[in-house]
Amino acid sequence: MSVEAARRIVVAGVCAVGVIVVAACARVRYDPARATRPYPHHLHRAVAVDIQVFRDSETIEIVNSTARSYSDFDLWVNQRYVQHIAGLAPGQTIRLSLWDFYDERGEVINAGGFWRTEPPAPVRLVEIQPGPEQPMIGLIMIRE
């Protein structure tokens, strides 16, 4: 075996080990058991109520400035990720972790954080779905 052939084998082996190490360290951000239903696009409306949403790193803060309470609803983020919320009273503020929002495949939104290698996903649209076939209620997203 020539020196050149031996060098190629060593380089190929090092590359293979590198690929395996990188793949083994990658964290999968999905949980099939947490898979939800797809976003119901036919229920989307361009109407918003006076409920503000503020992003704070890996969480969102929702401030209900209305006199109306909302109970037992689904909160949608970016027309993809959803979390069920027990209630939001008039004047109430709630903080929710973005890591608790899942999509139809069980994937979680990339909320960011110190150890993340990718930039966090922006939160652009937040909506309340009061019931299974009820139209969406848009919230006011305050940009970061």
Residue ranges with predicted function:
Residues 41-86:
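Short, surface-exposed binding/anchoring microloops in extracellular/periplasmic proteins
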Residues 38-47, 54-55, 108-119:
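Cysteine-centric segments in proteins
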Residues 79-115:
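Intrinsically disordered, low-complexity Pro/Gly/Ser/Thr-rich segments with frequent PxxP/GP/PP motifs
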Residues 65-68, 89-90, 130-133:
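A short, structured loop/turn motif at beta-sheet edges
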